[in-house]
Design a protein with these regions (language model features):
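Hydrophobic alpha-helical transmembrane segments of multipass membrane transporters and ion channels
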Residues: 150, 170, 202-207, 240, ...
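Hydrophobic alpha-helical transmembrane segments of membrane transport and translocation systems
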Residues: 283, 287-290, 299-366
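Hydrophobic secretory-pathway targeting helix
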Residues: 1-34
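Transmembrane alpha-helical segments that form the functional core of multipass membrane systems
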Residues: 129-130, 138-229, 233-246, 250
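Short juxtamembrane and helix-loop transition motifs at transmembrane-helix boundaries
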Residues: 101-113, 127-140, 157-165, 264
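Helix-loop-helix junctions within the multi-pass membrane cores of secondary transporters/permeases
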Residues: 99-101, 113, 122, 256-322
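Extended, hydrophilic extramembrane loops/domains of integral membrane proteins
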Residues: 84-119
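Membrane-cytosol interface segments
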Residues: 34-93
Length: 366
């Protein structure tokens, strides 16, 4: 049995290595012209005074690269690239980089679009899948399936939005699909799955109702500073959908943990009273509540670090950034934190009620 498991792990490791090597050598399958940089020479062209006494240096690179695909494969081409020392909006290229060129395979251009990155993605994604299956076995496989299905659902949702469908209706549907797909794939058809799905949707409804009520009482947010929305005319709907989908994962984590714990308590002690069961589930929820809220805070803070650095480097004060540039992130964090807190009593009550129903009256497993 152990030898069989080791053979499977070796097979998975071999598949992983082949997958990574393939993505590093798949130039022939690209429709975009690719080239590998053979040599780079550069010179400084000018420098400008920046904020806080710093200097920004400008460089020009003369790059010789060898074309990797198309009818011009093997030919050398010379391209130029300009970049700044901060590399905020430009990039410095190095010898050995594989880059995507402008134009087509039949007529490659002399401008670099970007670096070919599928090798890095294959290394990381393949490593994740390999570790999931090797460490957690069948559960890891189901996790991968749920990731793939959720990605497909997300892609269909975006496609529907591009086709002109209402984004709120789309998000309502995909929120339900995300919950069902994730929980059924990971937990199967169990009581704890039904209680987790029901708890997640109830909490999601409560926090969105609270958000709508606060807007109704105190007025809508000012969306003029949402720079990433550009010229879209439905900023409020997009922000509403953003809150719904962002909070879904954290809420689902709490409801699954509590439902699984309550189910295990009932399985070990079927005669436990409903009051005692609710008390135990509540204590479990309190243990994970602080951790989950802090996880949300860390995710929020880490995502804002580049923006904070750039704006403060341009003499925009910390208080100004907080007042005018991140109120939406703060609002999102507060609503999702409220969702985590609400998920505890809601999931405890629903899970306790469902788990205490006699199993002979239901056609699903404990």
């Amino acid at each position: 049995m152990k030898s069989c498991i080791f053979h499977k792990k070796y097979l998975l490791a071999g598949i992983y290595i082949i997958f990574v090597l393939f993505t590093c050598c798949n130039s022939r399958f690209y429709h975009t012209p690719l080239a590998k940089i053979c040599s780079v020479t550069e010179k400084q062209t000018l420098s400008r005074e920046g904020t806080r006494g710093s200097k920004e240096y400008y460089y020009t690179q003369n790059i010789t690269a060898r074309i990797l695909n198309g009818p011009h494969k093997g030919e050398k081409i010379t391209v130029s690239n300009e970049y700044t020392s901060s590399q905020v909006q430009t990039k410095k290229y190095h010898k050995g980089d594989t880059v995507l060129l402008s134009g087509s395979k039949e007529s490659p251009g002399k401008t670099i679009r970007s670096v070919k990155r599928d090798g890095y993605l294959a290394l990381l994604a393949g490593g994740l899948f390999f570790l999931l299956i090797c460490i957690t076995g069948k559960q890891g496989f189901y996790t991968i399936i749920s990731l793939i299905l959720n990605t497909v659902i997300f892609a269909y949702g975006f496609q529907a939005f591009i086709e002109g469908k209402n984004i709120l209706n789309i998000c309502n549907v995909i929120a339900v699909l995300f919950s069902l797909t994730t929980l059924i794939c990971l937990n199967g058809i169990h009581r704890k799955t039904f209680s987790s799905v029901l708890s997640t949707l109830c909490v999601l409804f409560l926090i969105m109702a609270l958000f709508e009520f606060s807007i109704y009482m105190y007025g809508d947010l000012d969306y003029s500073n949402l720079e990433y929305l550009g010229s879209t005319g439905n900023s409020a709907d997009i922000f509403w959908a953003d809150i719904m989908l962002t909070g879904l994962g954290a809420i689902m984590d709490v409801t699954v943990t509590i439902s699984a714990a309550v189910g295990e308590i009932v399985r070990k002690n079927p005669s436990v009273s409903l009051r005692r069961l609710i008390h135990s589930g509540r204590e479990i929820g309190y243990d994970i509540m602080g951790t989950m809220i802090n996880v949300l805070l860390f995710v929020l803070a880490s995502g804002m670090i580049p923006m904070f650095i750039l704006k403060m480097n341009n003499d925009i004060s910390f208080i100004t950034i907080v007042r005018y540039h991140i109120p939406y992130d703060i609002c999102r964090f507060l609503i999702e934190s409220i969702g985590i807190v609400l998920a505890i009593p809601v999931s405890v009550f629903i899970a306790s009620a469902i788990m205490k129903i006699p199993s002979r009256k239901r056609g699903v497993r404990e």
